[in-house]
Design a protein with these regions (language model features):
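Rhodanese-like catalytic fold shared by cysteine-dependent sulfurtransferases
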Residues: 1-10, 14-17, 24-57, 63-98
Length: 98
């Protein structure tokens, strides 16, 4: 297993990171990290080459970081450069950025 978690602070202080919320559309529309795009887990898993380029870095999150860690590790094994945002949306809600 590849451990590739990264802190929320680190990502949100970057210049134009590509942040992907892998939660379902309904949950995303209830609230999400500022600047995040929504690609639900099963859409991303089923068609990752349609959404991602191997030339970019992606920062993924879900509700608590578990599901995004799983898919991030899987995508990395396919040659993509992805990182899991540690703690997911729950961490964002208690952060200074919310």
């Amino acid at each position: 297993m590849i451990l590739n978690s990264i802190s929320l602070d680190y990502v949100l202080n970057m210049n134009n990171p590509i942040i992907i919320d892998i939660r379902d559309n309904y949950t995303y529309n209830l609230g999400h990290i500022k600047g995040a795009i929504n690609i639900p887990y099963y859409n991303l898993l089923g068609n990752y080459s349609h959404y991602l380029s191997k030339n970019d870095k992606y920062y993924l999150y879900c509700e608590n970081g578990r599901q995004s860690l799983n898919i991030s590790n899987r995508l990395n094994s396919f040659g993509y450069n992805t990182f899991n945002i540690d703690g997911g949306y729950e961490r964002y809600l208690i952060s200074k950025y919310y």
